[in-house]
């Protein structure tokens, strides 16, 4: 049947289905209740089926939102046997998520990758249409998975169609998908639809109903029936009520004409979180007292009046309401005793389904009941084990409400808040902690409240005194015997020392508390806390201990991540890269994309500081993308500022301006010093590379001013060489003597490789001619094996100095070496400077042509690098959370960009092969 008034909408859906073989995608359909979303979906399903597509559907139901992966189970049921085709670790994650198998809790993103690959395998046989109706009622775990999948369909023969009601929050809000917003029908279409369903209406009644329906298709089909009922003596629906309420009342009014047994069945069905007719019939018999089922064992006869009235559909043992408003109308019309009776009856027929059973028990319970609360807590544990963190939060929250013991109630609220922090649900965390704070808490519970309140935004919105207070709290908690909690609290305090500047006294207090916890000398938490709180004062201790440790190569990713970030803070970028790289390996396997984004950011920053742009570019891009996807806005801003620094090193001033502006929109609003400092560094390095030395000095000088919002304690130590380079070239070297004295003093306290490499470079630049050569040679004779960028910059500066001393022949070897290194690293501005100096020395030097870093996008570069290492498309896809088909599509675009025809040409094209 043609959908009246929806020609443009159906055309768009038809095009989406028709081009699925060439290009996949997703579309969000939004609109008011009854506006025709389901009708459009039915049209798309019919077209897809006729075109040979496999159709997989799921529908959100309000009473299922607490069941982890309930929507996903429905969606994947027809292709469940294909799970054997995906990678073993993904198989395990998906089976654990869907069945609650006794296994380690899978990360939701690993489950999502498994789903993407499972559906992609199905699409190898026939293109797939995924349908998610009423997305606003899907459980949180399913929502996370669908959001992940929807963003990765462009290269797949898969289309995802999702619907959501206007004004209802859902995963579509953050998915950034193309949208189809349904408006009311035009006047002509509305009149045609009304004539189709009520051809005999009088003109006056027709005009009134058209005005009241306001172009809503469901209203145009249901309000005439309500009008007919009122004409037979029923109460008319007030025209001033909102349309949705009037429709619900219209459905409710139709219930009164049904037999009592039918009404009972519909009431139970409205509260059932399953479409199983057998469950509904058994529970309805329990409510009515006919437990033996002597009247109508299957319930089918009692349902016939509801089917005839157009309220429900019954097919193959499944009962479905024709529209969600019918379900909500029945629910709203029930009294509390009726709802409790229906829930108790449903709980009674769900033996062997512990999670569903306890939620029905809970819904039938108004007063505190520890037995139900304990069952809900057990359900939370099961949900968490399956990766259903949102469901676990809901179960613990409800368990707290039903707890008889106030202390248990507090523990459950605090555990729920802790899990909600993992989800990034700030409002939920605040609500749970506010409830907990009203109870008579123990000292430890109060400490957990304080700690959890500061878990968002790295303490950016707190006062500077809060860092000291947090350290004091950790000290008291440790004294009370809970060292693990004390460490977590102290780690929060240490992170605040990075994101803000609490002052030297507070930093050293954090150190004092940490060193008083009697942790093992090589404990990763201790080393990370010391590095964040006192990168100079405890730099020697951290670097010495880090040097004794070996990365786990993915076996202990959390430890590797902590050690990698600690190494960053103390300026040991070579160690940072080693530990962070190991963390990336482990976190990829585990599917922990939130932490993976952070470790990739650390990898990008360390690689950029070492000058390895081939590693820094893709790591930063992936970190930024995952930071956005996992809702980490401050990390996203930080990585944007790091990308700006990379842009400066590549010689792309337009990109630097774009990225610094984006980073500072967040950084300035929250006074995030690391973001502002790196944005300023990017500006300074862009100017330095472009030969604008005075401008570079002005930008870089701000990093060393303690009252400037761009001041960051650790970063200033590792940029002293940049500042002096700019100062010397613009004749302002006298203005950096004070900074040099401070940095020399810092160098006496820490063996930081970055600080000492910068100091050696700076000393040579500032030296009188009589000492300059000695200091340049000292700088070059240091072990800079892992630091090619600073070595090449020193060679460039030495060559410049030699040429100014009229030793052109001596300068050329250093200038050539610098040029070759800069070319290899991709730091074009410094390559150009080396070429200029070579030409000034009397040696010609042609311009470097573009390489793979210039021709490929960051993600293409990353895929090309992995393929050059010998990884298969499937292996690359598993690492990057893409399907193998998407990887293949990328490679087909990469080959012509690099002028090659096969994978064997990747190594030479990237400069990594023979």
What are these regions (language model features)?
Residues 2-16:
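N-terminal pre-P-loop "Q-motif" helix
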Residues 24, 67, 314-316, 353-357, ...:
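Alpha-solenoid helical repeat architecture
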Residues 26, 40-44, 127, 301-302, ...:
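Extended alpha-helical scaffolding segments used for macromolecular assembly and cargo binding
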Residues 40-127, 137:
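Conserved phosphate-binding/catalytic loops and adjacent sensor/switch elements of nucleotide-binding enzymes
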Residues 46-51, 171, 203, 290-301, ...:
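Internal alpha-solenoid helical repeat scaffolds
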Residues 74, 189-401, 727-734, 897:
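Short secondary-structure boundary elements
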Residues 145-179:
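Sensor-1/coupling segment of RecA-like P-loop NTPase cores
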Residues 839, 845-914:
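Helix-turn-helix DNA-binding segment
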């Amino acid at each position: 049947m043609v959908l009246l008034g929806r020609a443009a909408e159906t055309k768009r859906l038809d095009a989406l289905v028709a081009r699925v073989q060439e290009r996949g995608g997703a579309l969000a359909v939004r609109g008011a209740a009854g506006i025709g979303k389901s009708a459009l979906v039915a049209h798309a399903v019919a077209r897809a089926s006729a075109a040979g597509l496999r159709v997989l559907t799921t529908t959100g139901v309000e009473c299922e939102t607490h069941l982890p992966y309930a929507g996903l189970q429905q969606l994947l049921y027809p292709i469940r046997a294909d799970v054997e085709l995906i990678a073993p670790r993904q198989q395990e994650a998906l089976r654990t998520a869907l069945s609650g198998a006794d296994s380690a809790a899978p990360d939701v993103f690993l489950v999502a990758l498994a789903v993407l690959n499972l559906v992609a395998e199905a699409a190898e046989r026939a293109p797939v249409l995924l349908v998610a109706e009423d997305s606003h009622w899907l459980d949180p775990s399913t929502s996370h998975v669908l959001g992940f999948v929807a963003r990765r369909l462009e290269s797949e023969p898969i289309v995802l169609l999702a619907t959501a009601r206007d004004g209802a929050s859902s995963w579509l809000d953050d998915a950034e998908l193309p949208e189809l917003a349904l408006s009311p029908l035009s006047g002509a279409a509305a009149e045609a639809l009304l004539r189709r369903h009520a051809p005999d209406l009088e003109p006056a009644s027709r005009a009134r109903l058209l005005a009241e329906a306001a172009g809503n298709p469901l209203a145009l089909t249901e309000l005439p029936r309500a009008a007919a009922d009122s004409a037979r003596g029923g109460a008319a629906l007030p025209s001033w009520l909102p349309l949705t309420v009037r429709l619900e009342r219209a459905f409710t009014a139709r219930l009164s004409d049904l037999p009592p047994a039918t009404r009972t069945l519909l009431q139970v069905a409205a509260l059932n979180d399953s479409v199983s007719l057998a469950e509904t019939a058994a529970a309805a018999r329990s409510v009515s007292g006919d437990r033996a089922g002597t009247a109508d064992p299957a319930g089918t006869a009692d349902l016939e009046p509801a089917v005839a009235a157009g309220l429900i559909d019954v097919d193959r043992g499944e009962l479905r309401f024709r529209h969600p408003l019918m379900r909500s109308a029945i629910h709203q019309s029930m009294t509390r005793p009726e709802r409790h009776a229906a829930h108790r009856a449903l709980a009674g027929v769900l033996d062997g389904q512990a999670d569903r059973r306890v939620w029905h028990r809970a819904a039938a319970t108004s007063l505190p009941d520890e037995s139900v609360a304990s069952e809900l807590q057990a359900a939370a544990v099961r949900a968490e084990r399956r990766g259903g963190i949102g469901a676990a939060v809901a179960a613990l929250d409800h368990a707290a409400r039903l707890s008889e013991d106030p202390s248990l109630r507090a523990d459950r609220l605090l555990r729920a808040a802790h899990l909600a922090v993992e989800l990034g649900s700030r409002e939920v965390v605040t609500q749970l902690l506010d409830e907990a704070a009203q109870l008579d808490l123990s000292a430890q519970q109060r400490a957990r409240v304080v700690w959890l309140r500061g878990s968002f935004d790295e303490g950016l919105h707190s006062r500077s005194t809060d860092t000291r207070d947090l350290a004091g709290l950790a000290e008291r908690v440790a004294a009370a015997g809970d060292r693990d909690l004390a460490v977590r609290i102290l780690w929060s305090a240490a992170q605040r020392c990075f994101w803000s500047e609490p002052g030297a006294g507070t930093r050293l207090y954090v150190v004092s508390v940490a060193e008083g916890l009697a942790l093992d000398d090589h404990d990763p938490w201790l080393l990370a806390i010391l590095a964040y709180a006192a990168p100079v004062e405890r730099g020697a201790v951290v670097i010495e201990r880090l040097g004794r440790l070996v990365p786990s190569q993915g076996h202990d990713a959390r430890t590797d991540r902590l050690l990698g970030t600690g190494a960053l803070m103390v300026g040991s970028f070579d160690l940072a890269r080693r530990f962070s790289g190991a963390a990336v390996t482990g976190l990829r396997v585990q599917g922990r994309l939130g932490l993976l984004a952070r470790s990739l950011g650390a990898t990008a920053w360390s690689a950029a500081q070492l000058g390895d742009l081939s590693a820094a570019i893709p790591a930063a891009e992936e970190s930024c993308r995952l930071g956005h996807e996992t809702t980490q806005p401050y990390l996203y801003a930080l990585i944007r500022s790091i990308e700006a620094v990379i842009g400066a090193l590549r010689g792309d001033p337009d990109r630097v301006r774009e990225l610094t502006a984006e980073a500072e929109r967040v950084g300035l609003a929250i006074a995030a010093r690391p973001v502002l400092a790196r944005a300023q560094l990017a500006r300074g390095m862009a100017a330095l590379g472009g030969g604008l030395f005075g401008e570079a000095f002005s930008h870089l000088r701000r990093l060393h001013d303690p009252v400037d919002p761009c001041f960051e304690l650790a970063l200033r130590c590792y940029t002293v060489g940049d500042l002096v380079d700019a100062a010397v070239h613009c004749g302002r070297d006298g203005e950096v003597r004070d900074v040099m004295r401070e940095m020399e003093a810092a160098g006496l306290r820490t063996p930081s490789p970055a600080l000492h490499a910068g100091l050696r470079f700076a000393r040579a630049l500032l030296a009188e001619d009589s000492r300059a050569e000695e200091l340049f040679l000292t700088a070059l004779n240091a072990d800079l094996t892992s630091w090619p960028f600073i070595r090449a910059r020193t060679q460039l500066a030495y060559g410049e100095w030699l040429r100014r001393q009229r030793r052109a022949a001596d300068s050329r070897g250093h200038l050539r070496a610098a040029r070759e290194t800069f070319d290899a690293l991709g730091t074009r501005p410094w390559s150009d400077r080396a070429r200029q100096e070579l030409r000034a020395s009397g040696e010609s030097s042609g311009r470097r042509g573009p390489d793979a870093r210039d021709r490929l996008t960051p993600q293409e570069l990353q895929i090309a690098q992995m393929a050059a290492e010998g990884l298969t498309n499937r292996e690359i896809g598993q690492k990057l959370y893409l399907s193998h088909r998407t990887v293949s599509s990328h490679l087909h675009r990469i080959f012509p960009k690099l002028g090659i025809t096969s994978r064997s040409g990747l190594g030479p094209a990237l400069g990594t092969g023979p």
